[in-house]
Amino acid sequence: MRSLVVVGLLAACSSPADVTPDATGEVDAASDASPDAATGVPLAGFGDLAGMCGVLADPELTGASPAIVHATLTFTRRFDDPADRPLLTTGGARMMATPNAGGSSGLSEAFAYEQLARCELAPLLKTETEIVYDTTGKITDLLVSIDGHKIGVSVTRAVAYPFGQPYTLSSATTLLTRKLEDIQASTANVSAADRWQKQALAYMSWDDQSTAMLDMAWSSIDPAIKGDTILIITTTHGDDQFLYSNM
């Protein structure tokens, strides 16, 4: 286990406000915001969230170019489910209470959503099993709304096992390529009722080294595979192993 990065306990344990519905070249999202006085983001919640917050607007949400966003999430203690669900946003708590379509990634999916809810005020529209598709095939993990635009979100993790091993560029490139191709497939399959404007690929990244490999992999990916995807990398610190363990 890496050494614990101690941050304000209030940020880890205060109750968050509810989040309610309401080309060429890569888009470079706006600079770090922690917090933004105009929008009040990031919202309080479980873990100290910082980095590029409140940065997704029409150029990123509707444009034909890909974009990349970096955030950090630091935990003073591990998440205790279900006792800590009240510390999540309404959508995050709903995700924790709803089975996904299989696998062991429920916590990482919930905290990837928390980043969107706390930074971009994104209400959860549908969970993985609620999204409707026209044909059987690749699916995405959740459907959210950002500034009135439906955005599909696929979630994955950048981590090497056993914990502490370096995350290789080869591993980063292989997984990133596969996930981007899956995004194109699920976009082709989704029903008209649930059709999103575009998709985001949300990574929970084990450490700064893993994130560096992701950045290198992203820069080398064929633009045709990137498409218009928004890559969101949330690097986690502190007592975060619960996000990367099989649950």
Segments from the language model and where they lie:
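Interdomain/boundary linker segments immediately adjacent to catalytic/signaling cores
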Residues: A38-R118
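A short acidic/basic microdomain associated with nuclease active sites
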Residues: A117-S145
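A structural signal for short, well-ordered beta-strand segments and their strand-loop junctions
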Residues: L125, G152-S154, Y203
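Loop/turn elements at helix/coil->beta-strand transitions in domains of secreted/extracellular proteins
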Residues: G148-I151, W196-A200, G227-D228
